[in-house]
Swiss-Prot record:
GO function term, MF aspect, one: structural constituent of ribosome
Matching HAMAP family: Ribosomal_uL23_B
Subunit and interaction comment: Part of the 50S ribosomal subunit. Contacts protein L29, and trigger factor when it is bound to the ribosome.
Domain of life: Bacteria
Any one of the GO BP annotations: translation
Lineage: Bacteria, Pseudomonadati, Pseudomonadota, Gammaproteobacteria, Vibrionales
Job of this protein: One of the early assembly proteins it binds 23S rRNA. One of the proteins that surrounds the polypeptide exit tunnel on the outside of the ribosome. Forms the main docking site for trigger factor binding to the ribosome.
Similarity annotation: Belongs to the universal ribosomal protein uL23 family.
Swiss-Prot/TrEMBL keywords: Ribonucleoprotein, Ribosomal protein, RNA-binding, rRNA-binding
Name this protein carries in UniProt: Large ribosomal subunit protein uL23
Length: 100
């Protein structure tokens, strides 16, 4: 059983991009930035509990941080884990919640 504290720490933020928007429109898939140590089961449980929707599948990937330079200094951005969460048919998740 996953604790409620852990559920709140798994999802960091929704990932908004052109590719994520197209996936949401075509395949009913939502993209989240998640904790690097989060498992697929934890991500599924967190989405189902927080947004009250049914999850069909979860695919994850780790996006490696880019190397950036500022003058002679060189640094590296942090790695980010993303989760593509596919919702079951008839399920909908709306972050904006505009007027209808």
């Amino acid at each position: 059983m996953i604790t409620e504290e852990r559920i709140l720490k798994v999802l960091r933020a929704p990932h908004i991009s052109e590719k994520a928007t197209m996936a949401a429109e075509k395949a009913n898939t939502i993209v989240f930035k998640v904790a690097k140590d989060a498992t697929k089961k934890e991500i599924k449980a967190a989405v189902e509990k927080l947004f009250e929707v049914e999850v069909k599948s979860v695919n994850t990937l780790v996006l490696k941080g880019k190397t950036k330079r500022q003058g002679m200094r060189e640094g590296r951005r942090s790695d980010v884990k993303k989760a593509y969460v596919t919702l079951k048919e008839g399920q909908d998740l709306d972050f904006v919640g505009g007027a209808e």
